[in-house]
Amino acid sequence: MPIPFKPVLAVAAIAQAFPAFAADPAPQSAQTLNEITVTGTHKTQKLGEEKIRRKTLDKLLVNDEHDLVRYDPGISVVEGGRAGSNGFTIRGVDKDRVAINVDGLAQAESRSSEAFQELFGAYGNFNANRNTSEPENFSEVTITKGADSLKSGSGALGGAVNYQTKSASDYVSEDKPYHLGIKGGSVGKNSQKFSSITAAGRLFGLDALLVYTRRFGKETKNRSTEGNVEIKNDGYVYNPTDTGGPSKYLTYVATGVARSQPDPQEWVNKSTLFKLGYNFNDQNRIGWIFEDSRTDRFTNELSNLWTGTTTSAATGDYRHRQDVSYRRRSGVEYKNELEHGPWDSLKLRYDKQRIDMNTWTWDIPKNYDLRGINSEVYHSFRHIRQNTAQWTADFEKQLDFSKAVWAAQYGLGGGRGDNANSDYSYFVKLYDPKILTSNQAKITMLIENRSKYKFAYWNNVFHLGGNDRFRLNAGIRYDKNSSSAKDDPKYTTAIRGQIPHLGSERAHAGFSYGTGFDWRFTKHLHLLAKYSTGFRAPTSDETWLLFPHPDFYLKANPNLKAEKAKNWELGLAGSGKAGNFKLSGFKTKYRDFIELTYMGVSSDNPNKPTYAPLSDGTALVSSPVWQNQNRSSAWVKGLEFNGTWNLDSIGLPQGTHAGVNVSYIKGKAKQTNGQETPINALSPWSAVYNLGYDAPSKRWGINAYATRTAAKKPSDTVHSNDDLNNPWPYAKHSKAYTLFDLSAYLNIGKQVTLRAAAYNITNKQYYTWESLRSIREFGTVNRVDNKTHAGIQRFTSPGRSYNFTIEAKF
């Protein structure tokens, strides 16, 4: 058995020692949003699912998505460069293959297709990441591991992250008509300061909630032990356009790809959540929601390939970026409850959402004396907008029989999306920016498109036998997604010929399933089983991205199929007075992965698949032609264990507890030729150990964490889809590491809470695998020297850092 399994077996053995059989736990309360409302008699543990409630978010000092999953080894955050993160990685897939929803509303898709990254992503001119959300707005986060389109819809191949926003009812009631919360703090890793206000009130049948948060900070620090090293130009490494010979560019120092420090950055985020509701009576309620969030990041991109300096006079440009992520949402909902009727509860909802991902770029000359008053500044603006309008109708009904309970959840919904893009650039006079020295060039790189979708689902939970001994759930969902490229009247006949099925809809439809079984075979032990499926409809850039160029001709492909996943899981869970544990094994199969595929050389024959017309109508001959196509499949399997032990059960002081969370996963991708290759998105084995104490008075507590992560072996990586037989070149920098963290809290009276944490206490230098696999071998951003790897320490994680928060509630 491979060595990485040994810690898993060790914690499994610990599970046998968990005395989880001392007393019956208290009855579980009713489930909430997106859960079937049932009343159980034992603690429910679900395979591949974790709920993180507001109390835990505060305890863990969660300020971003990295903090959210810090102590969950089964999920990681995809690094997206200077503009922030780009979604999550779960069970060997990432980015758009992991669904992200806020109150059931899907968040923006990224521009992360292999084709887009080959053409544009390597140069940093687009903010192509998925948008993030303000953690202070949420009352609960549900993380699902494994295919889950039954609940989360398109994109839930590897899993889903579902956020639920706060409501006034979280804070106010008939006995407490108002609430005011004030929170502030600092985050050491990026010099962040933040403040947040939560206010809620209730008067007669009216209630309201306001959450306003402001954050500002700088670049995320690293743990570099090197200065900005000097490296000699060995040929034309740094400036492919240079005609002056190697002697002109001798040594690159504090700027360029060899830079060891993060690029200077300042950023600010402002977020507003407002809810207003009115209860007509106990059965009928109407509500309104408004969200507005904007993050601006200003970066001096000193590590850009083109900013390399020399020992002679300064040349090249300073490159400045402003990346903007903006999200606005408004919606209305109606709730109804019936004692007798086709539903116990009904929720009707309509939401509109706008997400903008923008990038401004300025190239400013380093030496103004070269051209004096005639110095020019290059400016470009890339704008991606995604608009969504969605309606849903959700119903819940529970039927009680003498020895069984049948709880059903059913509903339907639909929506439409609209994608708009802007892309233009120009030169202006440095000393008088009103004077343009070039035309404003606007070109079409991303074809704008419209989309529609609709779905219907039916999910059931059956509680059978006395004392809720058996629980069976089964559900089915139907989805239909369609998209069409917008027909622009400015398109020439030749351009229209480049876009197949222009204006017509291309649809993807199918069913998703989910079933599970929970057998309580002893008073405190459960046998769990689960089967689920997932799908992901092709994104707009995978379908419609077009690049008609003689050196790299990319054809649009509206005939792509949806990616599919099937997930099997088996587990053993136990709970009792002394603690709880869950051990599970899983296997997931993926198929029809969308990949960039080389089709061959171009032809001037319109009947051949490699026909490659240019915008002027000229057909290319003997140019390389590429297209996104459904190609490979993959499988992953692994083990997960998590458990909590209340150590007062063995005589230690009341409130002492220990915990462990372990994840091990392996897998392979299967190419069209039958070859099995490693999967770069698989995270190495990791385990989190925890020892803590919470005073019985609830006044104070302290927690210590140790995180052990294995190295990502080069043999477990692949260079690229074009080079399947060699490892990722930067995998050799992945080493095993252990981190130690410490957090504590102190309640001062009933109103004030102080929280503090120290991370990476030993100041360990280490690289996360997500950081190493984000390095690019070509382009101008996220680079190191390909030959010497100079600049690799720019990708080290933060060293020792401290977080602090103070919160007052009234």
UniProtKB/Swiss-Prot annotation:
Positions occupied by motif TonB C-terminal box: 793-810
Keywords tagged on the record: Cell outer membrane, Membrane, Receptor, Signal, TonB box, Transmembrane, Transmembrane beta strand, Transport
UniProt domain TBDR plug: residue ranges: 34-166
Domain of life: Bacteria
GO CC annotation terms, alphabetical: cell outer membrane
Pfam family, one: TonB_dep_Rec_b-barrel
Keyword Signal tagged: yes
Gene3D superfamilies (UniProt xref): TonB-dependent receptor, beta-barrel domain, TonB-dependent receptor, plug domain
Domain TBDR beta-barrel: 175-810
GO molecular function, one term: siderophore uptake transmembrane transporter activity
Protein's membrane topology: Multi-pass membrane protein
Annotated family: Belongs to the TonB-dependent receptor family.
Name of the featured protein: Hemoglobin-haptoglobin utilization protein B
Annotated organism of origin: Neisseria meningitidis serogroup C
Source species taxonomy: Bacteria, Pseudomonadati, Pseudomonadota, Betaproteobacteria, Neisseriales
